[in-house]
Structure formats: structure tokens, C-alpha cells
Amino acid sequence: MPLTLSRWLPGLLLTAALPSLAHAEGPEYGPELQGFEYPYTVKHFAFESQGQSLQMGYMDVAAEGKTNGRTVVLMHGKNFCGATWDTSIKALSEAGYRVIAPDQIGFCTSSKPEHYQYTFQQLATNTQQLLKALGIQKATLLGHSTGGMLATRYALQYPEQVEQLAMVNPIGLEDWKALGVPYRTVDQWNERELKVTAQGIRDYERTTYYDGRWKPEYDRWVDMYAGLAKGPGKVLVAWNSALIYDMIFTQPVYYEFKNLKMPTLLLIGTSDTTAIGKDIAPPEVKAKIGHYDVLGKQVAKLIPHSTLVEFPGMGHAPHMEEPAKFHQALLAWLNKTNPVR
């Protein structure tokens, strides 16, 4: 059922009246992140999906210098965009890879539909259509956070097109609902997302992503997310975010890790404590979820051809926290592991 924008106006007016929930902090960006500068040129892929015309923003960055003829596709996380891969794009390009970094539907520079049936299968299909249009038949996937769940689904759906699979602190290494996390409805998620602020994002990420640490360079990414959430498209941004959270919570990939056939790399910051719904979970449930120091080892045993690289003391985004150390480990594995041809 299409979203009726007027339905949400009372909530928006209420939000505007509560300065503790929404305040004029930082920049505002358009509904497709207009006004935010990406590290490379953003192109747009137009396609039809679920009876509507949509577009995906993406970066297509050629190898610098001598190319190795291979392509890496980057899949961003829930609170991230293609732009947050900036240091990874540079490192991979300098190493001879062509790099494709799309923004998925509902995110960042891509369409925010009024109605969309979000599934990881659908997002994988959209991405595969983009790669086909770009003439890419095989690629290595690198997924971060929610992008790890999407990369897993893509690898299961199109195994013949995936040479290698690498995941950076993917969420979905456990099934939160099976472990007792309560269900939050789409409407409840939407109400929560309408109240997003830069300070709220910063506090959450400092605690959950970075183990209490913060670097000034992270503020750019907070402003990106918060600026989109409070900009002129905030109603549709929040609604799509709510639908995406429901997809993440209800569509686990955990039970299918055993079916992955390609070489797989898990890059895990061990101090990460991310778990969807943790904020509303009972204390006894909260205590047992989101332990990446344990989850990485457990899931590595489930994936047939896996390699685990841990970054002790790092959090949810080691590629942003310590780029040099992260990319050294990533490139070493990519270069020594024979891709599926």
C-alpha cells in the first residue's frame, strides 16, 4: 500500500517541537543525498522493479596503473553509504582492481520508493542487473555490516558469478529473533527513525561501533546519515529505513553459511557489539548477543572455505578505524587465494 505522506505530518510536527529529539545540528541533504560530496563520480543505473522506475547511484572506479583484470563489488552497511568505502576504493584501485560501489535502493544516492518489498534476494537481483549492464560477469564481493548479509545472499543466489567473498563485521552472524529479541513492527521502526539526530547517531556509534573511542574523521559520516534523515526527504528516508530494518531482522542468512562454496574471508573487529533490537531486548537476552569476539570464530567454522582475520580491540568498522592495517590483511588474502573461475 503506498505511503500517504500526510499520514506522518502530525508526527513530524511533534518531532519538530521536541528539540531533544530533532535539532538544527549539522547540514541537511536531499532525499538522494544531494549536496553530499562523494569521493568519486556518482553514476546512475535506471531500471524497473516492482512496477516502478527506480535508480541506483554507484561509483565505478578503474584500476590505477596496471590492471589485474578483476573487479571488486562493495556492499555498504545499514548506517553507511558507498562513500564510506573511500579508503577501500583507493586501496583496491591502487592494487589493480576495478571497483564498483553501489548504493542499494532505499539508501543514500538511490531511490527511496513509497512502497517496496525489501528482501535480500531483491537487492541482490538489483545489484546483479547493474553488474550485467556494466559487462561484469564475475567479481569478488566485499560486504560490510548489513552489506555482509547482502553479499552472502548474492553469493548463494549467483554462486557462479562470485569469485571470492569477503565480509567486514557482517551483521547476521546470529539469528536475533531466535535468541529472544522482541519483534519491532515497521511502524515502530518508522517512529524511531523519524527521531534520528546527529548526536544520537554519534553516541550509538561511539558505544557500539568503536568501543567508546571517537575520531574527528567519523563526524563526516555522522553528518551524512543525519543530514539525509532530517532533510526534505526525511519522511520517505525514515519509512524506507524502517522497511529495511524489518528485512534485516526477519531474513537471517545465518542458517545458510554452510552452503557457501567460494573462498570466504571474515574480517572481524572483536570489540564490536552490534545486534539488531538489542536496545529493547530483555537483560538476559541482551547479555548473550552481539559478541563479535565469539561470533567470528563460530561462523568461520560454519563456512566451508573460510579464513578468519581478527582485529583485536577494533569495533564495527575496522576499514575506517585502521585503514592501513585492514587493507594490508584484505589484499594479502585476495592475492593469495585462488578465485573461483
Give the residues covered by each predicted segment.
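Conserved serine/cysteine hydrolase catalytic core
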Residues: 230-301
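Conserved HGGG/HGGXW glycine-rich cap/lid loop of the alpha/beta-hydrolase fold
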Residues: 50, 54, 59-109, 329
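Flexible "cap/lid" loop of the alpha/beta hydrolase fold
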Residues: 152, 156, 165-196
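Conserved alpha/beta-hydrolase catalytic His-Asp/Glu region
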Residues: 196-258
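Conserved acidic catalytic loop of the alpha/beta-hydrolase fold
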Residues: 121-139
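Glycine-rich "HGGG/HGxG" loop immediately N-terminal to the catalytic nucleophile
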Residues: 43, 83, 104-120, 176
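N-terminal cap/lid segment of alpha/beta-hydrolase-fold proteins
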Residues: 31-63
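Catalytic active-site module of serine/aspartate enzymes centered on a nucleophile-bearing elbow/loop
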Residues: 293-341
